[in-house]
Structures are given as C-alpha cells and as structure tokens.
C-alpha cells in the first residue's frame, strides 16, 4: 500500500493537473451527434479547445454560455436558456452535455434545475437529450471529470430497472481516459472476434480517431456512442469497466442491467489481458481467435527480447491515477522499478498502488524527487519534455495533452499488441540512451591523424 505524501506548497509550478471540465469534454466527445456546452466564461471553453486541438490536431465541437461579470453576479440562467435554444435550433443535436465550471459552481448555479425549467418553457426541444454534469475546476482533476460524465450518463439516460428483453450477444464496455482511440479500436475488434456486439462508452474511436470526414466542419461530434444504444445498455449480456476511476460508474450500472459487471483496472499486463479474453470466451462460448493467440505469442517473444534491456530500469511517472496504476503494474510485470511517482491530486485510490510513496504535486516536485532518486525513463505528458531534457531521460508520452509528436493521441498501449509495441519502444529508448566511452588514444602515438584515416596503420619513416 502506497503512502500519499502531501506537500505544503502554496502554488503549482509546471502543473500536470488539468481541470474536471477538460475530462468531461473529452468524454462528451465520445457520444454520437452531441455537443459539449460549458457553463462558464468564454475563456473556459477557449482554453480547453486549444488543448484539444493541440492533442488531436483536429477541430473540436465545443460551445459556451459566455458568462460575463453582470451575469456572474446577477444570475446566468438566461445564458443557459439562450445557449440551449440556439444549439437546438441551429445544430439539431441528438444530445447536449451541459457542464459546470469553477465560475458557475462558485456562483451556486443549479444546472439541473435550469434544465428542468428549460423543458417547461421550450417543449418544442423535447427530442434533444440534455445531460447535466457538475465539474468544478477547484476539485479533482481531468480523471474526475471524465468519470463524472459516465456516471451522469448512467444515472440520467440508462433506465433504472433492467428491461425484460435481453440481448444475448451484446456487451457493454465502460472505458476510462487511459484508453486512447487506438486502444478502443483494439477492444472493439476483440469483442467482435467472439461474435459479440460491443456498446463502448465513450466511443472516442468513432469520433476522435483522426479520420478525414466527408463534408465541411460539423458543429456536432461525428461518430461516438449512439444515444439509442446507451438507453439499451441494461439489456446487455455482460459489462466491463476498464479503469480504477470507473468504480462508481460500474456500481451505478450494476442494478440497471441483467448481466454481470466485471471491473478491470487496465489491460497493460499479461494477467489482466488474459482475464479479459477469458471472460469474452466464457460468455460467448467460442474459442479464442487465432489472431489473438498469435498476438499473445508475439508479446511473449517481445518480453524475452527486451528483458535484458528493461530488467531493473527505474521508471518515473507523472500522470493521473488510472495511468499510474497501469504503468506501475506494467513496470513491475517486466522487472522494472516504478518510481518516483507524482499524481495531480491525492485521490484515496492511490493508496492501492504497488509502491512505497506517491506525491500529489507538479513537475517541480518530480524534479526534486529525481534529484534524490534518479530514474532511467520518464512517463508523462508533453509538458514534461523540458524536464526530460534536463535529466537526459527518454520521455515516454502518456496522458493529456500530447502535442509535440504526431499520432501520439491514438497510440495503442492496452492489450497484447499495445504491450508488445510499448516493450519495443522502451527497450529502444534505453539502448539509445546508452553512453559509449571514447577509445583511449595515447598522446605518444605516431602520426595519429594518418592512422585514423588509414584504419589504424602507422606510417613508415
């Protein structure tokens, strides 16, 4: 059990923390034909949009209620009414995800009450589903905002009691922020390989996978989980929740569906991935496909090839709780040593990490820890690039945002293929970091210049 070591710093220097609204917006982008609506000042949404465009290198649908000083003091209910009415009329979305911010939460805005009042005054928009999520910036981090959207989706859109009909070939997949669009594509392929139909929430692989969509820019998400499938999640045969932060979401889903809810912290170890595949084979009644067995064999071969380079290497990690859990287990499974570890917040779930200490803090705290406890690798987002250069450490990019290399937002880390490629990446980084010593050349050597040019032969007098 890890000890959560809290510092007395009154400020954050080079923070790794991103607020709840960013996580909530990211989860909202995985719902089909929806649009996130941020209840706050224009700067709240503009800052988030810059982050997402840097990360995905694609336009992102996002709107704001544009609170100003007057509405902040006198009340901003009218801003919500105007924004919802405008979006429903102009964009015709299937769903709107209304998110609070630190500004609206400090004001005391009750967005659920405002939406109920909007339903009464604008009955013509009853066909548009509106989800309300409280995501204050001053509490938690991106991970909390992401999981809050999934919890609200289950509470507000999934029927409270399972329906009589059961779809025996359908499986629910709740995925946390640690799963990239590439990871979600791999999960979908695995489930479909067993003859099952997955409902993935949120399905970023359909909306934010970096595909070139037909037509002009759309103000709505192009792809994602259909609202109709979300409403039918209670009829599924089984459910998986991948991510420690989805514990409450899986607890909310359990009484709403007939099938079992299986919680997995991640799929970055052979044991966890085997458990996932075994459950799919069990509920489907089918044998494991040959391509999955081959990928497992490729992973085992990669473990043998990379063992001599990774054994005993120290891995420093600065990331959200779910990513810390995944990378710590991955490091231990490959004979590496995780630590030092820095998390953006001191969530109690960090105590379950298989290390001695976790520091809730920022990159300055990680810098201090690296001075006392050197590492061989650094796992963090792109903001840690300068820190990696300072300590001459290879940077393995993980988390959010990833803006200094193309394609990192969809890199596969989960599953057999993700672990295989990650092993090769880490081993190559360690090999490149190896510093070769220059050959000793005696100052008494005759004609050193000519000996270098002639392959070491001495010139005759």
From Swiss-Prot:
One of the GO BP terms on file: nitrogen fixation
Biased amino acid composition, Polar residues: 444-454
Pfam families in UniProt: Oxidored_nitro
Keyword Cell wall biogenesis/degradation: no
Region Disordered, residue ranges: 441-461
Highest taxon above the source species: Bacteria
InterPro entries: ChlB/BchB/BchZ (IPR050152), Nase/OxRdtase_comp1 (IPR000510), Nase_comp1_CS (IPR000318), Nase_Mo-Fe_CF (IPR005975)
Pathway involvement of the protein, from the record: Cofactor biosynthesis; Fe-Mo cofactor biosynthesis
UniProt-annotated binding residues for [7Fe-Mo-9S-C-homocitryl] cluster: 44
Keyword terms: Metal-binding, Nitrogen fixation
Keyword RNA-binding among record annotations: no
GO molecular function, one term: nitrogenase activity
CDD domains: Nitrogenase_NifN_1
Stated role: This protein may play a role in the biosynthesis of the prosthetic group of nitrogenase (FeMo cofactor).
Family: Belongs to the NifD/NifK/NifE/NifN family.
PANTHER family assigned: LIGHT-INDEPENDENT PROTOCHLOROPHYLLIDE REDUCTASE SUBUNIT B
Protein's name in the database: Nitrogenase iron-molybdenum cofactor biosynthesis protein NifN
């Amino acid at each position: 059990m890890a000890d959560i070591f809290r510092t007395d710093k009154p400020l954050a220097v080079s923070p790794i923390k991103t607020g709840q609204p960013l996580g909530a917006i990211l989860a909202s982008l995985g719902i089909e034909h929806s649009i996130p609506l941020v209840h706050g000042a224009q700067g709240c949404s503009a800052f988030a949009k810059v982050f997402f465009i840097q990360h995905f290198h694609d336009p992102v649908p996002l709107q704001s209620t544009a609170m100003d000083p007057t509405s902040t003091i006198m009340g901003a209910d009218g801003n919500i009414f105007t924004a919802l009415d405008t979006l429903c009329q102009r964009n015709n979305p299937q769903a709107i995800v209304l998110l609070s911010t630190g500004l609206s939460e400090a004001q005391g805005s009750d967005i659920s009450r405002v939406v109920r009042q909007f339903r009464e005054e604008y009955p013509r928009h009853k066909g548009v589903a509106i989800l309300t999520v409280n995501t204050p910036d001053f509490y938690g981090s991106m991970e909390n905002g992401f999981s809050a959207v999934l919890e609200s989706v289950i509470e507000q859109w999934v029927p409270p009691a399972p329906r009589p009909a059961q779809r025996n070939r359908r499986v629910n997949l709740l995925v946390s922020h640690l799963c990239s669009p590439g990871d979600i594509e791999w999960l979908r392929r695995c489930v479909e390989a067993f003859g099952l139909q997955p409902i993935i929430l949120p399905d970023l692989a359909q909306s934010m996978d970096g595909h070139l969509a037909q037509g002009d820019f759309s103000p709505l998400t192009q792809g994602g989980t259909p609202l109709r499938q979300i409403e039918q999640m209670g009829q599924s045969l089984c459910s998986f929740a991948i991510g420690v932060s989805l514990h409450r979401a899986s607890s909310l889903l359990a009484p709403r569906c007939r099938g079992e809810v299986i919680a997995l912290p991640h799929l970055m170890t052979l044991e966890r991935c085997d458990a996932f595949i075994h459950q799919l084979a069990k509920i489907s009644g089918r044998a494991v496909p040959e391509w999955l067995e081959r990928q497992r064999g490729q992973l085992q071969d990669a473990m043998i090839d990379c063992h001599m380079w990774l054994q005993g290497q120290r891995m420093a990690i600065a990331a959200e709780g779910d990513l810390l859990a995944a990378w710590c287990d991955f490091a231990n499974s490959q004979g590496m040593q995780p630590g030092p570890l820095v998390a953006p917040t001191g969530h109690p779930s960090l105590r379950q990490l298989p290390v001695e200490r976790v520091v809730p803090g920022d990159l300055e705290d990680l810098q201090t820890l690296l001075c006392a406890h050197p590492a061989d690798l650094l796992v963090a987002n792109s903001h840690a690039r300068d820190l990696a250069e300072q300590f001459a450490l290879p940077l393995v990019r993980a988390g959010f945002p990833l803006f200094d290399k193309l394609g990192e937002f969809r890199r596969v880390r989960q599953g057999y293929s993700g672990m295989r490629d990650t092993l090769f990446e880490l081993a190559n980084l360690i090999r490149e970091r190896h510093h070769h010593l220059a050959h000793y050349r005696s100052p008494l050597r005759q004609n050193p210049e000519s000996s270098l040019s002639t392959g070491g032969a001495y010139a005759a007098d």
